[in-house]
Amino acid sequence: MKKTTKMFVMAALLMAGSQIHAQEEHQYVDLGLPSGTLWATCNVGANSPEEAGDYFAWGETTPKEKYYWTTYKYSYNGAESAFTKYCTDGRYGDGRHGYNGFYDNLIVLQAGDDAATVTWGNEWCTPTKEQWDELKSNTTSSRTTQNGISGRLYTSKKNGSSIFLPLAGYRWDRWENKLEGVGYNAQYWSSTLNDKDSSMAWAYIITSAEWKVKSINRSSGVSVRPVRSAK
């Protein structure tokens, strides 16, 4: 991000009442959350809060052309129900077993499989399901636009600081290689696997009607908004 761009972004957010902090080249907001979690102002791959950034399958650390089971890193031979990592059930069963009886009971992304950590450094990670729940419980949410981009603004109930999540859409290319739902919905990964169905991982879903934590297909191309711990 260029210096002038950084100054513009910081000024805009400060005007909105947020206390912006810089950590090397990545900025974050203290929302006064009980856990002390600090939320980044931008998505991975973005240069401003309203920019979509990159899309990632769950547990993958680089964007790609096609998001489906046939291209998913941890799917055995393109199967949607046979996994080589992050699996809680080795028995045969739709969408919840490892290849050839494999299971590892890993339910949280390891650092080397976390797009936020690999891209931004060890102090950053993808939020857990619990951190998304905490954000939703401790902020108010409103539909808004920022520099012409639709999204939701999450404002702290404690200190009035806020973060903007753009409606960046998502990728899942079973039939066509295209981006879905830009300006209407968004999906943001958590680092937490659905331990009842290993084909799914938890994500924060934003639509015109709702915003909640929900499990989705882990081969989908989804946004990542990093978090870090307070120093």
Name each model-derived stretch.
Residues Q23-K231:
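Conserved positions within compact, well-structured domain cores
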